[in-house]
């Protein structure tokens, strides 16, 4: 099993798809990594040799991924909340941030419906 950036890459998947198991690496980034390393997208992870894996590790090392990316995102959200701007206010209240309607829908952000009795108390 290949281990890149502290993540086990599934050996039965293609290199492009396997790389997406790393937080912060999507399909496009995975394709760019494979291209930079000279590896075919459709090559299985188990078929990659050590030199290929080392090239991939080097490319992935240049990116902001996993814990660093999560930390950066949380710091950015905290900064918005500290500023008191509209987006920060929406984050703080747990409401949609990007202008979606809230009269109906937005149940994912707002959580399950509260009954009329719960609102009166």
UniProtKB/Swiss-Prot annotation:
Stored PROSITE patterns: RIBOSOMAL_S13_1, RIBOSOMAL_S13_2
Alphabetic keyword roster: Ribonucleoprotein, Ribosomal protein, RNA-binding, rRNA-binding, tRNA-binding
The keyword Plastid is annotated on this UniProt entry: no
Molecular function via GO: rRNA binding; structural constituent of ribosome; tRNA binding
A Pfam family per the record: Ribosomal_S13
InterPro entries: Rbsml_uS13_C, Ribosomal_uS13, Ribosomal_uS13-like_H2TH, Ribosomal_uS13_bac-type, Ribosomal_uS13_CS
Biological process, per Gene Ontology: translation
Region annotated Disordered, chain positions: 94-121
Tagged with keyword rRNA-binding: yes
Domain of life: Bacteria
Paired cysteines (S-S): none
Gene Ontology terms: cellular component: cytosol; small ribosomal subunit
Family indicated by similarity: Belongs to the universal ribosomal protein uS13 family.
Assembly notes: Part of the 30S ribosomal subunit. Forms a loose heterodimer with protein S19. Forms two bridges to the 50S subunit in the 70S ribosome.
PANTHER family in UniProt: 30S RIBOSOMAL PROTEIN S13/40S RIBOSOMAL PROTEIN S18, SMALL RIBOSOMAL SUBUNIT PROTEIN US13M
Functional description taken from the UniProt entry: Located at the top of the head of the 30S subunit, it contacts several helices of the 16S rRNA. In the 70S ribosome it contacts the 23S rRNA (bridge B1a) and protein L5 of the 50S subunit (bridge B1b), connecting the 2 subunits; these bridges are implicated in subunit movement. Contacts the tRNAs in the A and P-sites.
Name the UniProt record assigns to this protein: Small ribosomal subunit protein uS13
Organism encoding this protein: Leptothrix cholodnii (strain ATCC 51168 / LMG 8142 / SP-6) (Leptothrix discophora (strain SP-6))
Gene: rpsM
